[in-house]
Structure formats: structure tokens, C-alpha cells
């Protein structure tokens, strides 16, 4: 990139320089390697027409089973979507960093087990694989790049191990982080839980070969198209508060990332009475990188809701409905004013805006009025009261806190949404253009649950109901969910640089570095 510096004393004095940005997670690591780094199956190459293509992902975390340590990552990273063989070398960095040459890589583990059956890949319940570490090749503490709770003298986040053990379940609006091969350290929040999602795969890492789809249940989605990128598959998603594992990253779209719940991943690899746990220590410190200005600003951008203004005719219709029901709406004691604007749950559709006193109990405010959605705007005290003109409504809305893409919701709301989700998820997933159904929070009614309907951009779909069995619905349109994020646009995340580590002393019983 080009950087220009201008003198504050004399604007005519300036200079430019070209700077090459190196993503720290893509570098060759000194042994023993820390995780969150680039890696791949040494056999993950495709040669066609004299051209060789190779792929790479993220060596996500360290787990233990029966006293043996394994690297945990996505199946399509370590086990080639079921095409891998037990014993395959797992190398660091991934072949994608070395122009597909084994030169410059080191074998850090050997493939042990994957989750895909090559004869029936669509039956997979998780996208995960484990590889037994080569003695001395991997940091035994489970450190992950940039996930530490402290910084070095330059202000760069140190590596840090996650909370050891079994991890925790995700909840809507839980603050999370990950450190991956492509986008480094990124921070965001859980957008939805209980996600049923259709994910596209191909048998070859370059997108060629047999195409197939896996429909997963009980998944977790993370907000932000730039929370991850191609090559971040296999990253461990952890809580920002103390790096407790939450999910294993494996796919995404241009708006969201999806991961397997860590409980499902660990249970899959339990064997012979031996359970699987994350290697780490009891940790109280936060992922300090998420409090730095760059990652913090990027997270705020990911969580900001974007308004899509309805058509003039739609707003006119909503105003007529509002006026016809003004007495009923103003009869609720918490409602200070009623206006008209945009829905955030159904972008591009109008909404009747109910300006309510923040913290005051709600008296069964309607979600729909004659087919028009309502949107609740909370504030301490609004300047205007009663029915608002278009200009007054816009001004009053701008005086309130801007809406966020996700809010925390109480367990009672989650339980209510789970009942509706279970009753209707199958029929919704069969609709043309629908690629996912989940439980999230309503943006139009903060504090209430909603069913998230993930749609595929530019694919026709039936009308989505405004609410189902009393639960509001939300629409989120995006590119196709795809493992490896093929075709995803350029990333906007700015990875935090990391200082080079000094070479560690040789481990006496370590195996020599091998070349695949």
C-alpha cells in the first residue's frame, strides 16, 4: 500500500512510501509453533493442464484425548473434505504460502481423524479434523497467536492459550474473537444460535471436482462479512472476556461466518471412553487485542445496522395505517410518539415507529398493525409527542441511540423462539432461496427474539411471513454459505502485527523436520 506523510507545519512538505503488509499468521513459525497459524495437508494440491493449485487454512487449537495432543482444525483443511488418509503430513505454513512447494514447510502433525465420509459427505454433522502432533513441533501450552491478555512493549497482543476444558455454549450477542491465517485477529458478536444452514462444498480445494451440500443443525453464526476470509477455516472462536472456546470456524458468506459448536466437535472425537478437551489453563484475562482501537472500530462497524429506505408508496401506506390506529397505539402508557420509518428486521419494508420510554415495562405492543411492522425506538425522553410528521419522525429517530444488528435476549425469549424454530424450521429450509434458519434478536423490537431467515442474494424466494406463531422474523440476504469462502470479496480487516519469536531450544526427543 502507498502511505503519504504530510508535515503539520508545512503542508507542502510531504513524502510517500510503499509498504508491504505481511499477515503475521501466514509466516513460517519457529518450532514449537503456536496455533492460529497457516497450515494444510501436505497432499492438498490439484494439478490440471500443467498448473498446480494448492490450498491452506488455519491450524486452530490444541486438544487432548487420552493424554495425547492433537491439532484441531476443519476437515476441509486437514483431511481434504474426506479425501485424506490417516497419517497424512500436516505442514506449517500451508502450501499456499510456499507456492505449492514443500520446501519451506515443516511437518507439525499427522492426520488422525476427520468428520467427512467421502462416500457420503453430505451426512457430516461437523466440519472438523484432528491430527496428532509431532513431538516438539507444537507449543504444548496451546498458545494461539494474538489471543493473549497482554501486549508486548510495542503494544502488540501476545499469544495466549484459551481456557482449557470443554468450552461454553454460545448466546446471542456474546462478544467473540478469533485469530486466523488470513484476517488475523478479528472481533465481533454472535449473531444467531440454533442455526440450520446449507453449506456448499467441492471435493477439490480449488473449487473444482464434485459439488455437494451439507445441511448442518445447531450451528453458530458470527456477524460481519470481514470477521473471516478464505483460509481462516479451522480457527477457534472464543469469548472476548476470557478466551473460552465457543465454536470452530468452517464457512461463511459476505455477511456472516458460521462455526460448529465446540461441544459437538469435542463429542464427535470422543473415543474408547476418552473424552476430548481443549488444552489451556484457567484464564481470567480478556483477549486484549479486541480492546485496541483498530479491532474495536472494526467490531463496531460489523455490529452497526444499515438502513434500507422503503419506497415512497410503502411509506404512504404505512402512514395511512398509523393514522387509522393512532388512538390504539398512543393508548399504551410507554409510547410517547408514533412515526413512520424503515424496518431493520425486513430491510426495505416500512415500519410504524413507536417511540417508547426506555426501561418502562411494555404493555403488549403489537408486532404488526394491518400488515405493517412496528419498530420500537427506545429513549429516555423524546422532545416531540403524539403523531409525528415525516420530518419530525426522522429527527426524533436520529436523536435516539443508533440500532445494532444484535441485542441480548432473555432465556424466556430464547425458549419461546426454540419452540417455533423446531416447529417450522424444516418447512422454511425447503423454501426456494432460503439457506438458513436460526434464533436471533429482533432489531425492530430490542429484547425480543426473532427467527432469522438467511436468504441467498438474487435468488427468488416466496414471501417471508412477518411473524410466525407470535415470533417476529428477520431477513438476512447474502452470498451462498460456502466452506472456504470461495468467491468472497476482498477483506477489510486489518490484522495486528506480531513480533517474531526467537528460535526455541531443540527438544531432545523431537523428530527431525520432514518434507512431504
Spans of model-derived segments:
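Helix N-cap motif at beta-to-alpha junctions
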Residues: 356-362, 455-460
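C-terminal subregion of chymotrypsin/trypsin-like serine protease catalytic domains
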Residues: 226-228, 238-301
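Short, exposed coil/turn segments at beta-strand boundaries within extracellular/luminal domains
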Residues: 8-18
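Short beta-strand edge segments in extracellular beta-sheet folds
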Residues: 18-24
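Protease-domain processing segments flanking chymotrypsin-fold serine proteases, especially trypsin-like
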Residues: 24-70, 82-120, 134, 287, ...
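Serine endopeptidase catalytic core focused on the charge-relay Asp
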Residues: 28-217, 238-241
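Terminal peptide-recognition signature
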Residues: 59, 73, 131, 173, ...
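Extracellular/luminal low-complexity segments enriched in Ser/Thr/Pro
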Residues: 1-2
